[in-house]
UniProtKB/Swiss-Prot annotation:
Main location class: nucleus
GO molecular function, one term: DNA binding
Bridged cysteine pairs (disulfide): none
Species of provenance: Oryza sativa subsp. japonica
Name listed for the protein in its UniProt record: B3 domain-containing protein Os03g0120900
DNA-binding region range list: 7-110
Source organism phylogeny: Eukaryota, Viridiplantae, Streptophyta, Embryophyta, Tracheophyta
Ranges where the record places region Disordered: 328-381, 412-443
Keywords: DNA-binding, Nucleus, Transcription, Transcription regulation
Compositional bias (Polar residues): 416-430
Subcellular location: Nucleus
PANTHER family in the cross-refs: B3 DOMAIN-CONTAINING, B3 DOMAIN-CONTAINING PROTEIN REM23
GO cellular component entries: nucleus
Biased composition (Basic and acidic residues): 351-366
Magnesium found in the keyword field: no
Amino acid sequence: MEEVRRHHHFIKVMVGEFARRLEIPQGFLIHIPEVDHSTFDASLPSSAKGTLQNSEGKTWPVELEKLDGHVFLTTGWAKFVEDNSLREYEFLLFRYDDNMHFMVLPFGLNACEKVIRSSGSPQGKLPCDIFCCTKRGRDGDRLTEAANSLTPSHSQVLQRTTQGHELISPQSFPDQHEVCGSKDGLDEHLSLNGPMEDDKANAIAEVMSILDVDKVTVELFCAMLVFYKWNVDAVAEDFDICRGKPQIQNLFLKHKLHFQFDIVKRKLRKFFPPDDYYSSPILESRKCSLEEPKLSNQPLQCDLTTEKCRLVDEHDLCNFSQKKRRKRGSFCSPETPRRSPRLARQNNSHDSAENTLKERSEERQPSPDSMIDQAESRSEQACLCHDKTDSGSLFQDSKKVKPAHGEVDLCEEPQHNQGENEGNLDQVNNKETDEEQIERNAVETSESFTRRGCIKSSPASCEVPACLRINELSLTWKPAEHVNPLEKVLLDIQRDNFMKTISHVQGIIRNHPSDLLTADVITVVVQKEIFKWNCCLKDRDAQRIVNALLEHARKIKEMHNFNSEMRKEEFSAKLKVHLKWQLKEVETIYTSLELDYKKATSDDNIAFSMLHDKKKKLHNLQDEITGLQQSLEMKKDEMQKLAHQVAEHESVFQKSLMERLRIKEVMKGYEQTLAEVKVQLTSTEVGSIDIEALVKVEMDNMTKEIELSKESLLNITFH
């Protein structure tokens, strides 16, 4: 029987910089003669090239390097990690088959062997890693499929993210090797000249999805990019604060955010030319971002608040409730179109014109009494004029009413909304930090950027989301029921006056859309004329039109009374509070992850010690069984010897029995002879035969035979 050759094994847990190289245990090097005999710390001979093979038979060539007495798998190892989707805290079982050939079995975090489904092409495809994981705050374990390629097109990546692709790791954060492992594929993807015509917001979405950045990362990075006007260096400096948080005790967890944002910053530079960055230092750029919030020279095509919410929905990796996400998404502003240099110059000229008009209005600002008199005279002129507009439709005219920076957001109860806004400002002044207030602050911040001109609103040709569509104004008179003729005539007169007044107010708004006198005219007309028509104002459409006029007047006054510096400080404070809250949340997540890591480490140590004890007990039992088997073999030999002795004794005993029977037969013969002799003696003469001599001879013979028989019986020996 041939002896089965025993293979040697070792195990490695994926921790540290395992994506770049992997160390072979020093105790295992004695089984690799090519490496063990090499004593120089340098590249091993060319023959020290190995091969890794998985359970499916696929192989990867690797090279071994020796440094300070340690041997590492280097060239080719990164490809093996990438193709097998290895993640942190997973482990590999290596079996050495001689000739630098290793059989490798990967095991996931659930202690089960990973199932790697390879694609049809051996190159350019990433195997689909199906693994089981746990996620904080989720319902339980579920299977997730990783991406099939590192370099897909834009539509493929967005389709993959919308189909529910999630990075699933026990810490809910991507590890260092996940970003590092996809760098080569990302560089190749960004160097393509194909579908890179999309706007930069979509390109950033591609970067985020390829780097597997989670939701908190997207929110922080997008919010700070808006705040610092796309100055990536300024954003990176603020993220340096996260690197040195004293609350994060684990150095490895602390470096995760550090490493991740360095990669994001480096990749985002590919989308912005050098002119987009500020030549001044970071502190000066930060100061400028607070003093001059102009983005006309920046190539920004999309409102980042909307893009941030879209990215957040695609990268659902953190434990945020669906209510908060929906509430945040409902306040988002529409996406902005792609800007061109011509539009940028127009925006600059528009801003300069608005500034000059504002200065002139401040210089020529009349007294309140003169403004009211002028508004009353203008309203009287509007009431005396009865010419119809060219459109002939109040619905079409009312659609053209727009404020200075976009369409008017109309509602049925503007005063109620104004009260809510005032309440929100009071809550901000009182420094309330609850979650709803923080979300409201974030929404107001995004709206402030739109109002200040940093982010332009979308034109009429753009598709507006359903949640942001404006309620259209229309006026349809319904015939009144059970009304006497006099009231009907009065109602018709009031309706005609209402329509004529509204039409001429539309003309004033059309000629002077952002003039402060227009707001005064609207206020005076509504208070002194329209409020008198009680019967007409019972109609709901008329109420909505009046509310829209008052809202438009209020917005014009707000625009003229707008203080940029105060709003900058207010929005800066709100954004800082929002970012501090998110940073605290990140710290909390890191702390919980660190506790989980410590717990997992302690459990692993306990399990390893228990396994070691069980192995010792098993070896002891095996030794005892081996000793018992040896003693059993000895006992079997002794039993066989005893059986042979018993058989010999039985044969001797049979012989003695046969001898006794023979002696009995002889004695019987002698007795018969003795009887015959006695008969003869009685019949013959006594004197003729010496009877006594005969008897004595006979007795002597018998005595001798008995002695011989006795000696043979007494000389029986037992061995």
